[in-house]
Structures are given as C-alpha cells and as structure tokens.
UniProtKB/Swiss-Prot annotation:
Record-listed N-acetyl-L-aspartate binding positions: R63, N70, R71, Y164, R168, Y288
Catalytic activity reported: an N-acyl-L-aspartate + H2O = a carboxylate + L-aspartate; N-acetyl-L-aspartate + H2O = L-aspartate + acetate
Native organism taxonomy: Eukaryota, Metazoa, Chordata, Craniata, Vertebrata
PANTHER family assigned to the protein according to its UniProt record, in alphabetical order: ASPARTOACYLASE (PTHR15162:SF9)
Gene that this polypeptide is encoded by: ASPA
EC number from the UniProt entry: 3.5.1.15
Compartments where located: Cytoplasm; Nucleus
Name used for this protein in its record: Aspartoacylase
Source species: Sus scrofa
Cofactor comment: Binds 1 zinc ion per subunit.
Length: 313
C-alpha cells in the first residue's frame, strides 16, 4: 500500500431517505416502491433500508408540518427533552437519530442517501458536506462517470455559517441527492429515472468497494457555496424584483459581474455586483422564498481523493 492508498472500513448499513420534504415526490415514490419491492436496491452483504422520514408532511404533500426537518439535526434540537410541545419535525428528528444514529456512534448507519427534488434547473446534483472525505469523493467520481454523458454536479455546502444540520448528517457518510427541475407535488418520469440511476450507481460503487475493488486516486469538479442572495425588497420587506429571464434556468452556468440578475416590475435590470465570476445554484427555488434566498453563489473547485480500498481486502 502506498501513501496514495487509504484503507477504509467496509460499508455494512445504508439508508435511503425519501420524504424529508413531503412535497418532493420522486424520493417519496421511489422509497415507497422499495419498501414494497427492494430487489433493485439489494446488494450482497449490505443492509439497505428505505425509509420515509416525514410521513405527516408526505400525507399532506407539504414541505413540512411545523419546521424544516432538514435543518433541525443540530445538537440543540436533538438534545431537547421529548414532549408534545416540541415541533413535530424536532420530535421526528430525535426518532430518526435514535433509529439511524446517533452521530459518531458504533450503531450509526454508514451511509444515508437523502432524496430531494428542486424546482430549479439543477439536473442531477450530489451534495457533499466535507471536502476532505476521500470515500465520498471517490463515490461521487464513480457516479458522475457512470452517468456520463448525462451531467452530474457536486454541490459542496462546507461553510462556517451556511452549512446546515441535515437529516443525513447523523451518518458517517451523508449524501444529498437533488434532482430537478420538478414542481412541488408533481412526479416526472425523466427526473425519477435520473434519481433511480444515481442510487443504482451509488450502491454499485459500495458493492464493488466491499468486494475488494481498489479505486485509484481521482479528482472531481465541485461547486462550493459562497453566499446566499436574497431578492431585492421594498421598505415593507416585500419582494421588489424577480429573477431576470437571462438568469432563469441557468444554474451552474458562469455569471459575470454586470450580468442581469433581477428585474423590477417597472422594467429595471439589476446586475450582479462584485468583481468575480460565480456559478448560481437553486435559482428561483420555490421552497427558498420563505428562506429569503433567490439563488446561491458558488465557486468552482477541484477536489482530489486518495485511492481507497476496503480494509478487509
């Protein structure tokens, strides 16, 4: 073994979460299907558990009941004394942490795939929380290569103030899967097929790794979050301009200083400020209006991973 190779523990337990947001229907539909027939997600020697994370929100086809489940897996919320007064999603987070965590414990699941849809034109997106995770960089490289020529983007949310406490973060290896564009409360066959393929390739990678396949050093292109941009607002705090037509549906495309970003109702164009090119993501995402986020700025980086193999081989 050289210094470019790292031995990693084999993967034993994997969960696939759907319905973290109850109106993002691809994950809901796939997980419900796999709960009835799990043949396509089974791999030898691997426990793969499909799970509906927010059943009440799924039932009502809404993002959440009391608060966003994908933002409450922080120590404060997970440590609150259980009571009926707690928001439903905080109680649910504690249940999920007990079932699949707790984080950093011997009992926690090795990998959690959390399935999401976006109304933004983001295509196939993998969400990475740690830029130094050789195993996940290798997995994402495998998925991207397997999906080609279909593009698959990697969104790195590692940031001191913008990273959030995700549902999947209780696993050793948290993986967000985001596919769009798809309206809330709607199923599209093309989007479902893409998400299904992403999970297939991810499970194939895990199986190959567990069987002793060595993965040589690799590099992937990622888009790292820099800043969230709110809509222009008037004195009452109401939105005063909308996403400019030239920015709409242009996720992942370079956005230069001076390029149109917003358009007011009296026809005034508001351009991008600053002095550097950025790459916008979650452009005009429906769920982010309440979060005061018109889009997020990212910068493009290359991440390198050492070669990996299973410590059993």
């Amino acid at each position: 073994m050289t210094s470019c190779q790292v031995a990693e523990d084999p993967i034993k337990k994997v969960a696939i979460f759907g319905g973290t947001h109850g109106n993002e229907l691809t994950g809901v539909f796939l997980v419900k299907h796999w709960l009835e027939n799990n043949t396509e997600i089974q791999r030898t020697g691997l426990e793969v558990k499909p799970f509906i994370t927010n059943p009440r929100a799924v039932e009502k086809c809404t993002r959440y009941i009391d608060c966003d489940l994908n933002r409450v897996f922080d120590p404060e919320n997970l440590g609150k004394r259980m009571s009926e007064d707690l928001p439903y999603e905080v109680r649910r987070a504690q249940e999920i942490s007990r079932l699949f965590g707790p984080k950093d414990s011997e009992d926690s699941y090795d990998i959690i795939f959390d399935l999401h849809n976006t109304t933004s034109n983001m295509g196939c997106t993998l969400i990475l929380e740690d830029s130094r995770n050789d195993f996940l960089i290798q997995m994402f490289h495998y998925i991207k290569t397997s999906l080609a020529p279909l593009p698959c983007y990697v969104y790195l949310i590692e940031h001191p103030s913008l990273k959030y406490a995700t549902t999947r973060s209780i696993a050793k290896y948290p993986v967000g899967i985001e596919v769009g564009p798809q309206p809330q409360g709607v199923l599209r066959a093309d989007i479902l097929d893409q998400m299904r393929k992403m999970i297939k390739h991810a499970l194939d990678f895990i199986h190959n790794f567990n069987e002793g396949k060595e993965f040589p050093p690799c590099a992937i292109e990622v888009y790292k979050i820099m800043e969230k941009v709110d809509y222009p607002r008037n004195e009452s705090g109401e939105i005063a301009a909308i996403i400019h037509p030239k920015l709409q549906d242009q996720d992942w495309k370079p956005l230069h200083p001076g390029d149109p970003v917003f358009l007011t109702l009296d026809g005034k164009t508001i351009p991008l400020g600053g002095d550097c090119t950025v790459y916008p993501v979650f452009v005009n995402e429906a769920a982010y209006y309440e979060k005061k986020e018109a889009f997020a700025k990212t910068t493009k980086l290359t991440l390198n991973a050492k070669g990996i193999h299973s410590s059993l081989h």
